[in-house]
Amino acid sequence: MDQPSNGFAAGGLFLRHIDGQNASPPSVIVIGGGISGIAAARALSNASFKVTLLESRDRLGGRVHTDYSFGCPIDMGASWLHGVCNENSLAPLIRLLGLRLYRTSGDNSVLYDHDLESYALFDKDGRQVPQEIVTKVGETFEKILKETVKVRAEHEDDMPLIQAISIVLDRNPHLKLDGLQYEVLQWCICRLEAWFATDVDNISLKNWDQEHVLTGGHGLMVHGYDPVIKALAQDLDIHLNHRVTKIIQRYNKTIVCVEDGTSFVADAAIITVPLGVLKANIIKFEPELPDWKLSSISDLGIGIENKIALRFNSVFWPNVEVLGRVAPTSNACGYFLNLHKATGHPVLVCMVAGRFAYEFEKLSDEESVNFVMSQLKKMLPGATEPVQYLVSRWGTDPNSLGSYSCDLVGKPADLYERFCAPVGNLFFAGEAACIDHSGSVHGAYSSGIVAAEDCRRHLSTQLGISDLFQVGKIIMREEMTEVMVPFQISRL
């Protein structure tokens, strides 16, 4: 597939020149109003296609969700720009909108989304772990992970990353840790699990470090992702509260059936619903999807990470980016993101991933907050009660059924290619469909643009309109102001 160009991608920010203004425009239904679906709809709309976007929720954004009930923006889903650099496909739009980023780390993206010196870790008795121990263990953890590359080269078959770590430690006794240092190592593993949104025994040795990582480190979206969603969605034909139940391909047309009995007909459809929804077979296909497509959906992993956001009357915690609790097992570790440092608001966000996150969803909001506060008070005995809280449930939310995709142990080599591939007039997009940047917002965005371009080319050939509805010359306003509008970064 061709990579998306900035020219075809951006929303509401173009002056376009298109031939054939009197021809009947091709029609496309985009299913899913997350950033991938909105990007696809925006791109096709800018190419003068007739585009209808159907979204099951009562809002846009999908797993990108900015909540304002605290009186400030809180992203309860995606919240970082992974790769603060011009190569990031979202960079032009973020710069143009003047959205501020708070950079939380350098380029060591796979291991950490925060620099080690920004952590304050505490043991079970509330004593802060000396920074030199945190730094030393972090360096040891990196050495252990580098040694797993040798294990990978020695084994043809895949294995869980934790198994490879055990092999490394058996071979290198000097890397083994005990006592408090061992607990800090478990906390590092906890953070690795959060990156992949799954437990370490599910993380693939062959694929854990194969992601194409952009430069520039990680940037927290201080204003949230909501302004990006609104900018891209401007003037699109959007239907909220439209849950798709069936997709029919017949006579070179695509019929999309909605839960309330309504049907929409178009020349093609782009499916951007989350991987978890596809895995649950909530949407029926007629004819059924081919086996190669079904197996790609089945073989891709889906992880879960949830947030418990807590607003307090005042700040009682140290001025660091992350507060962490170390423990003898990674599941017993925990951490809080300090939004006060980035935004000035007295907010902590507890983040839980993997099986622990699934267990959390069985609790009520109040029970979740009580548990989180009990952990916080062990770290900081003077902690006060929150005045407001928010709790996410991405795993059981019927509109998501998971947070983002992950590589399971033994993943077939061609898995992403099969998942991305179209089936007739059906095209697939979303974070799980981005080969190089799965699990990220910019990956989902880029995937939507690629699917839109593939759909445009397909319909141009099928409908015999190859000379029409082509994007000849697109002038992006951000191209004219790119030099004048740099990233707004509050921490260098």
From Swiss-Prot:
One of its GO terms (biological process) is thermospermine catabolic process. The lineage of its organism: Eukaryota, Viridiplantae, Streptophyta, Embryophyta, Tracheophyta. A motif (Microbody targeting signal) lies at residues 490-492. Its EC number is 1.5.3.-. Its cofactor is FAD. It catalyses: spermine + O2 + H2O = 3-aminopropanal + spermidine + H2O2; norspermine + O2 + H2O = norspermidine + 3-aminopropanal + H2O2; thermospermine + O2 + H2O = 3-aminopropanal + spermidine + H2O2. It is found in: Peroxisome. Pathway: Amine and polyamine degradation; spermine degradation. This is Polyamine oxidase 5. Keywords: FAD, Flavoprotein, Oxidoreductase, Peroxisome. Widely expressed. It comes from the Eukaryota. The keyword Transcription regulation does not apply. GO terms for molecular function: flavin adenine dinucleotide binding; spermine oxidase activity; thermospermine oxidase activity. FAD binds at E55, R63, V244, E431. One of its GO terms (cellular component) is peroxisome. It holds the Pfam family Amino_oxidase. Flavoenzyme involved in polyamine back-conversion. Catalyzes the oxidation of the secondary amino group of polyamines, such as spermine. Substrate preference is spermine > thermospermine > norspermine. No activity detected when putrescine, spermidine or N(1)-acetylspermidine are used as substrates. Plays an important role in the regulation of polyamine intracellular concentration. May play a role in producing hydrogen peroxide during seed germination. Belongs to the flavin monoamine oxidase family. InterPro entries: Amino_oxidase, FAD/NAD-bd_sf, Flavin_amine_oxidase, Flavin_monoamine_oxidase. Binds 1 FAD per subunit.
